Amino acid sequence: MSSIVDVIAREILDSRGNPTVEADVLLESGVMGRAAVPSGASTGTREAIELRDGDASRYLGKGVMQAVENVNTEISEAIIGLDAQEQAFIDQTMIDLDGTDNKSRLGANAILAVSMAVAKAAAEESGLPLYRYFGGMSPMQMPVPMMNIINGGEHANNSLDIQEFMVMPVGAANIREAIRCGAEIFHALKKLLNKKGHSTAVGDEGGFAPNLGSHAEALQIIMEAIEIAGYVPGQDVLLALDCAASEFYKDGKYKLAGEGLELTSAQFVDYLANLADQFPIVSIEDGMSEADWDGWKLLTDRLGDKVQIVGDDIFVTNTKIFKEGIKKGIGNSILIKINQIGTLSETFAAVEMAKRAGYTAVISHRSGETEDSTIADIAVGLNAGQIKTGSLSRSDRIAKYNQLIRIEEDLGDTASYPGRETFYNLR
């Protein structure tokens, strides 16, 4: 009864008003799975390729009707009749059908929409919540959230070069209290920014985007907001950064235009180490450019014992690239973005590789999101331990937090919240 009988895709809009792909997978039993794919702003050069139409007369060339057509024709024909429970086989069927290394023929956005919808349909058919379908009956751990409350870089039109300034409520007793903590800090920060005469406009991921003089000033304001909200920085709440350093790495230098700095790899490592000395920073994502593997090694050697060094653009959720990074001692954590690789099976393989290598895994959204909350179920089902899904505003971000609250309620007393223990590989 779990045979696929129909696959339908459509063009919908993401949180930035850009087109994306949504797919429905219908099973013989009558159940349906529906999924929509996200899209990134700062992207790794080796990510799987999302297919855009390039027709300037529609959506400024960003339409996805060709990807939709690929789902409704080639992909549909290839997987109708297959058992939705056979996720890996279906994913491999689509990979083989595409025939490229980066899913550029059919589009990673087309393939991923179907991959996710198949899983949702199979879970529904099994009578299991999605997180249980992913993780089985083993004990479930709720993820510690990375909450992006100040935006810079490609996510905001301001003077900050570092892309995300985040809080992590490690002192909370459960995910519900962690989300409350983040929300209270978010509102305290809004009042504080207003008081200081800064803009409270928000960026793509719902964080504030004030024009501040330096990254240290942004971190200091967050520290103040944490205290105003009634929490203790460094105890209840830790800080995290996503530098997205590839975006300001030019001609072999890290060019921090907002601070008028042009730094070598070693100097930028010193810069980040200085911030980590001044503030309770527990995680730095993409601290170096994806093109600067030597810089990554410097950063890992300098801070990797006490700070989570997360690879996003450098690893792009790709096990072949990630395996190379592990061998070279690059980072100690991987960011997991489902649309970077384009199928759930490959995503899950990257998480498993991280666990075997002693790396942490952070399940992540993209800056262009939808109401789809699949990543919340992935974070819990795979016991990833961490999730990064934006700020405490914009319903595309809140959808994931609300799903985590529902999952924790469903799990009851069996749900654990790791807090600081999520950083098991730090000293």
UniProtKB/Swiss-Prot annotation:
Catalysis performed (reactions): (2R)-2-phosphoglycerate = phosphoenolpyruvate + H2O
Cofactor(s), names only, from the UniProt record: Mg(2+)
CDD domains the record matches: enolase (cd03313)
Keywords, in A-Z order: Cytoplasm, Glycolysis, Lyase, Magnesium, Metal-binding, Secreted
Residue numbers binding (2R)-2-phosphoglycerate: Q163, K337, R366, S367, K388
Entry's Gene Ontology molecular function annotations: magnesium ion binding; phosphopyruvate hydratase activity
Enzyme class: lyase
Cofactor notes: Binds a second Mg(2+) ion via substrate during catalysis.
Metabolic or biological pathway, per its Swiss-Prot or TrEMBL entry: Carbohydrate degradation; glycolysis; pyruvate from D-glyceraldehyde 3-phosphate: step 4/5
EC number: 4.2.1.11
Family matches, as NCBIfam families: eno (TIGR01060)
PANTHER family: ENOLASE
Protein's recorded name: Enolase
Organism phylogeny: Bacteria, Pseudomonadati, Pseudomonadota, Betaproteobacteria, Rhodocyclales
